[in-house]
Design a protein with these regions (language model features):
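Alpha-helical transmembrane segments and their immediate juxtamembrane cytosolic regions
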Residues: 1-307
Length: 307
């Protein structure tokens, strides 16, 4: 049922996007006041202006249709792209189910996605301008990866990886290391180097995570937990970075760096390890406390109703 599917995806992807950006819209002036944002451009600082009521309302309405966003909610591009990808795929599959086979559809869709991805990557023509305007720079690359996943589900790919764990682990690890020196992927802005580079990086990255997960129950549990609570990470990822920046500025005071540095103080030193860990752990901790509090309040309500 396509309608039910759309409703389900709206609840799990669209609604979190709107609520997260609503939170950062409401708190924008407060964050400006305490220095998390700044009106002045500086070292790694993207200036933010105060919001009046009309500007805030306009921003909220824009977020309802996936337009715009907030600086600290930058990671929510993933929710927007995944929603559009899954809905487009579901609708097209439904409309074409009696016209062409699914294999034919996947092949055509992959060709279109690959062309679109390369055009966006190279900033070619009106397609690049259009996707930038509506904030879907990552759509074609994400759709391409989504289709790869659909294909792999129909193969014995996972079984092959299980049977050749060590060789696949070494291949994926060394391969990703070499690719890191060749180019980089910035999916949020549609930069993928080229189609082959993106496809190979995606496959090798998946193999590495899969092998590590199946050989460690603890890591598998962690990956599963992170996956089930990823909305908290997407929502609070960049805000959590401010914890690291704040501690760094206490230890190493620098006049040319402020708390408003975005997304991080420096990108090319070991601080990225702290940013990565805090950017995941802090949101998960907030989510854990929230769910515990919600469960407690719910149990108290049930207790009062039964008293």
């Amino acid at each position: 049922n396509v309608v039910q599917y759309v409703k389900r995806k709206a609840k799990s992807l669209w609604l979190p996007f709107v609520l997260i950006n609503l939170f950062f819209t409401v708190t924008q002036n407060f964050f400006l006041k305490i220095g998390i944002y700044s009106t002045d451009a500086g070292a790694s600082v993207l200036p933010v202006t105060p919001l009046d009521t009309s500007a805030a309302i306009k921003k909220v309405l824009g977020n309802i249709i996936f337009s715009g966003g907030s600086q600290l909610a930058g990671a929510t591009w993933f929710l927007r792209s995944l929603f559009c990808i899954t809905i487009v795929n579901a609708v097209i599959t439904y409309l074409l189910k009696n016209i062409i086979s699914k294999k034919t559809y996947v092949f055509i869709a992959m060709v279109v996605a690959a062309i679109g991805m390369q055009l966006v990557n190279n900033n070619v023509g009106s397609i690049s301008l259009l996707v930038e305007k509506i904030g879907l720079q990552s759509f074609f690359a994400g759709y391409f990866a989504y289709l790869i996943g659909m294909i792999l589900k129909k193969t014995t790919y996972m079984q092959f990886v299980k049977q050749h764990t060590l060789s696949c682990f070494l291949l994926s690890g060394v391969g990703l290391l070499l690719l890191n020196f060749i180019g980089k992927i910035q999916l949020n802005v549609g930069h993928v180097e080229n189609v082959a580079f993106f496809a190979l990086s995606s496959l090798l990255g998946w193999i590495l995570i899969y092998i590590v997960s199946i050989n460690s129950k603890w890591i598998a549990s962690c990956v599963e937990y992170i996956g089930r609570h990823s909305v908290w990470i997407l929502g609070l990822h960049f805000l959590s970075f401010k914890i690291v920046t704040m501690v760094y500025l206490k230890i190493v005071p620098e006049s040319n760096v402020t708390l408003a540095a975005y997304p991080v103080v420096y990108e090319n030193n070991r601080l990225w390890i702290a940013y990565m860990l805090i950017g995941i752990i802090a949101p998960l901790l907030v989510g854990y406390i929230w769910h515990k509090l919600f469960s407690f309040l719910k149990s108290m309500e049930i207790y009062r109703n039964n008293a």
